[in-house]
Amino acid sequence: MNLVPALVLLLALAQTVLGATIGHDKVQPFAQPDPVTVSEKAAVKYKPQLQISDSCVSFPAVNAAGEITGGLKGTKGTDGCTEAPLGSQVYGRSTWYQDKWAMMFAWYFPKNFWGGGAKSRHLWANMVLWIDNPALETPKILGASLSRQTLEVPKAVFLSMGEQQKDPYSKVTAIPPMGFVGMQAIQTSRISRFRYTYNYTGGSDISTRVSQGYPDNSAWISLTFAGTDGEYQDLIMWNQLTDQARAALESADFGEDTKVPFNDKNFEAALAQAWPF
């Protein structure tokens, strides 16, 4: 047996399984397929918008061949990540969890941010939207869970610069009015010097909007509900990915501090952490 071709083949297979790393701006996103199943139709119907103001835009993390993004070094602010030249991507996965239907929508960012500045390579963020039944004509939104980072807050000369988050999700059982796409707040009256009452008008009751933002000035960037509209990205569900892409997302190493939340290894645990009821 000729060992050279055999070794070449083994190396090629290993590369396919583990996923080769390519430039963050060279990853071709998946086009959003026409939804066929009940779960796919519900995910498309409830797909959220992502609004970006203080960080990188979202980028695709893997292509059809299983090649994984290399991300960007956590320096120089948003240099190199203000636009995804080949298009962005939102990843999805759905399942029954206890007695609720859970839809996870996840975004990948090539840099992570703290206190307004880039700090490290790679970030995954996700939202879990909980509904009663995807087979209904108009399922009821029961709650939402938005991921946030639990990393240690940097210190300045032995002084903490903020509070470290303990729970990896912020959770609500009612979406705030301004969390819906198109919603506008109309000021109606003044209660006190800094307090007003509002009416809310013009918004969706299905599509939500989230943003990458800071809970305070000394915090790691996390998902929050947005006050203004963002953009939709092409949605690709876990079972719509190619075998190579799924295998790559199972084995890819994005670092100890951020994990692919919707792969087989992490999905169930993420839903347990996101449970808001």
UniProtKB/Swiss-Prot annotation:
Glycans are attached at N199. InterPro entries: NPP1. It is found in: Secreted. Residues 1-19 form the signal peptide. Keywords: Glycoprotein, Secreted, Signal, Virulence. One of its GO terms (cellular component) is extracellular region. A motif (Hepta-peptide GHRHDWE motif) lies at residues 119-125. Key residues/motif important for the effector activities are degenerated in most NLPs, including the nlp24 peptide consisting of the conserved region I (11-aa immunogenic part) and conserved region II (the heptapeptide GHRHDWE motif) that is important for phytotoxic activity. Belongs to the Necrosis inducing protein (NPP1) family. Secreted effector that contributes strongly to virulence during infection by P.capsici. Induces cell death in the Solanaceae, including hot pepper. This is NLP effector protein Pc109174. The lineage of its organism: Eukaryota, Sar, Stramenopiles, Oomycota, Peronosporales.
